[in-house]
From Swiss-Prot:
GO terms for biological process: regulation of transcription by RNA polymerase II. This is Mediator of RNA polymerase II transcription subunit 14. GO terms for cellular component: core mediator complex; mediator complex. It comes from Pyricularia oryzae (strain 70-15 / ATCC MYA-4617 / FGSC 8958) (Rice blast fungus). The gene is RGR1. It holds the Pfam family Med14. GO terms for molecular function: transcription coregulator activity. Its main location: nucleus.
Amino acid sequence: MAAVMMNGVGPDGAMKPNLDQKLNNHGGDTKAISSSEIVQQQTPARSLQSDNPLRMNDLPDEIVHITENFLSLNQLLSRLAQRSHNELEDTIRSLAKKPLPMPPMLNGNADHNTIEDLSNENLDKKVTLLKFAQEQHAKWVKALVITDWSKKASTLSKLIDLKVHMHTQMEKYDFVLDRMMHNKRNLAYARLPSPDLKTALEVLANGDAPWMPDLGYIPPPEMSPEDQLKWLEDLDTLLSLRLTIDDHDKIPYHFRNYRIGSGRVTFIVKGEFEVDLTIADDDPEKQYWFIDFRFLFRPAPPGLSENLRMYLELKVNEVLGAEGLAGCYKYLHELVLTHKINELRRQAMELSVGRWVDALNVERLNRSLAVQYWTSRYPAKAPNAPKSWIIIGVHSAAPSGGLRATAPTSRLALRWFRDNQEVKDIEIPLDEADLSMERILKDVIGRHTQQILTLMHTGLRNKPRFVNKEDHLVLELSRKQPSESLLTMQLTKLDSMVVRVDQIGGTFAVQPRTRPMPMAESNLNTPGRDPVAVIGWVRNTFAMEELVRRGKSQGWVVGKPPVKPDDLRNILSNREQTDAMAWFRKQGWRPQFYVLAHLSMSGDQWWLIELTTPNSNSAASTAGGIRIRTHVQLQFASKQAIMESPSFFSDLNYFTSAMISKMRDLRELHSRRINHIDQPCIRPGLSSNIRMPTIFIRTSEVLPSLSGKGSLGRWAADEVRLSVANVQSSSSTEVDRRGENRSALSTRMDSRIVIASEARLRVLDKSKFRQLSSRVDRDVAFNHKTGEFVLQLRSELGETMIDKLISRLQTIERLYEFLGSISRAPRGVQCETVTLRRVVFTYSDLPQPVSEELAALQPPTKRWKVVLDFADPRTVKLVLEKNNPHIRAVDMLQTLANSPRGLERLPFYLPTTLAVYRALDSISDAWLQLQVSRKGTFEIFTKNIDLATIRYDLPGPQARRLTLDVKLVSRRGELSWHVKRTDAEPNKSNDEFSRVLKEVWNTKSPNWKSLSTSACGPASAGVEELLKGIDKAVRTLLESPPLVLQQQQQRQPVVQPGQQPQVQNQANGVMNRGPQRPGLPGAGGLGAQMRQKQVPQAPMGNHVVDLT
């Protein structure tokens, strides 16, 4: 297999054959070697061992055999054949795609003549085929040339090796000659003349040598110090005259500041240099001469080196001679500018390898300096990452726009490119007197940092959160120290976020290093991210994490969203990608209530959400179709207080529980069609200044009596203010103590929320409640100053307060009715305890009109206690103490207390009827033993509280019955008890009751008044003496036999022995030996109560008393 050598130069400098030149030059000289001799690998001469005899070109080891870039002839021909085959296929496909020529047709038949086709399509195909053949022919001709040349490759390879070896040796020879000549030139400076030892010894010994030549120089006379001073003063005078008179118009503008002294003039250019010049002649046309030069900026060398001084003296003197002072200033000014640029470059290079390593890229231009800062701000792989750099160069100060500046001169100028854009509207000053590249970079970076933080501050300041001043946003800028520029944003009351820009790296640095901050810092340093959105995300995330942490520590549960995000579109219309949301639920709440916290830069929002509870069998439930039933936005008086109050979540529990209770109460009021107003009010006791829900209810629709049409009239204001006073947790043990079934509560949580609401009702006339104490009941208070009732209502969360409120209002109305009647009642009625659940008062007989002396001598009267229990809102329970005379009428009193205006009449009837019932008890107790011994019966029938019927049944042959009515009547404005006989036998001649009663009716007593057939006693103790007198008269009939029996005994025959006397049965007589009637007395002191027969009637009958 043959091999082909590629032309070129190897790594050791050897020449290589140029293959392309050979392939393109068909007629060139070619040499060939036999195909059996193949060169495969380059073997450098230094790598060959002397003991290796195998050399393909039979050359010594010192000659390097060139084999680099050799290619196998077989491989070359194979590739060429494959390429020719592929191009042939492509040509055939292209010819097939070309359209066929359309032959001419005659009468519909194609012409089949053998005439040559000269159509464009046919010619195009032929040209394509011809080009392909020519190209392939040329390639294969080249391959044939290479094949023929390869037959002579062995001889040519030796020639190439020899040529390269000879060329290398010639290069070495030329290098040695050049080095020798270089050393010879350098030795010229080290050459010393031959020493004159004879002359040296003579001079050292005698001080002079006679054979030394004498040049005949006359030394100038020595000058004394006074002459030297005078000479310098003269020189100063000449300089002053020349600069003032001759060269006044020739002095450059920047050389106006100069001083003269010590025989020289010093021109001072502030911030650049000062140069000392002098004159050598008093001719004003002669030039100035250079003496010294000093830099006037820092840092700069303290003095000039000898070489620089010599060069500068020659150059400045040359310029002074050619251009004068103007040329001198221009030359030195440009020299200083160049030196300043070099000094700034030196400082930049030191910074780039020092504290600012990997942050600066310093590049020296023609007469300028380019410094790129923040090179590591963006990742190296970031495409099209913006760059920032500065260019410090010399500004020509050429006038622009035809305006000529005053004394224009070149100066150092700085161009700033920020994020690939040149900043032209900002002039960055350079302190040319004190050069500091670090200070320049800090100034530029400070401005860049200011621009970044200002844009962020502007973007955040326009957010509603900061427009409404809910949080603090502070921007602090410093150009001298960019690291002190920072943007501070309040996250919570105690936490703030500080954003800085690293002055060296240009990356954002965020503090404090809490959990979301590293991610925020990474996002801020990512190209393409909006810093305002990132900072907003940090604030919302940090604040939400703080809320979740505090909420969990106070018994709040944070769960997954129970609804789909689409359901929140109607609630949260201003959602952003940086928002944060959390669903809170308090332990003890029902599962359909949640608090949704939505934090955003547009403002924080808190929503109370009530979800639907679909049936488990419904399709919506199986599909997870829980929807939002009610949503109420929680309004806070101060939104900033959300994060500031440590008791925020306890206040939130208070507020949301109140809202849930309010929602239930509003639905109840709506269902009952009671007018109301929902108006939130601020409760000062809450630290967050939360607007608590308050409901104002129209009282006249709850209590119809307040409409003014009732008998009581309007006694209270027509509104009740209902608000939540407290929220408490009720444990399961308290539920058990209440007697509730534990198994019925198995689905509830162990801790339940109890709402304590406060209802305020203001009375119109507070003097009518003066008998009340400030603490009416354990949950009712009355303010005597404002005349306001404060009711405490308790219920579980989610239950309505309206039923309890209506019940309490009705109780207050009954209490008002009773207290009004107490104020109008006789003086015998006194209140002892007045609460909303229980009223205790005492009563006694009506006071008699006696003098004060007699009243003081009378013993105190017995007072009887009455308890009115209002615990049951539907009824009033009346309780009398033991042995109270009114016990026999307790049922009627109970009915009276629960009747309309009954509580108003009760205090009137009790002292008015006390004497009557006490007399009846006394008479009943006196007849108790008589009834046991069958001597007669005494019965009381209480038809009404002011009407009683008493009946006497005496034994005898015929029934003897006396029936009397005791009725309260009013005559001439005075109350009295009228006692009269109501049976059918008062006019019989043999009526013994009329005989004994006549004595009573006709008796003149100061305690009652006789009315011939009846008597009338006052409501005080007089009626009691009247009834006892009647009873005493009736009991006289028990000692003598009846009048009828005496007459019968006179006509009755003597009874024979063995006969039984015939005794007439009396239906109601006590002498009947038959079974005892139910009305017989029982045991104990309450026998009178058990003996009475009460007829159920209405509590108030038709009587003559007018109580209005």
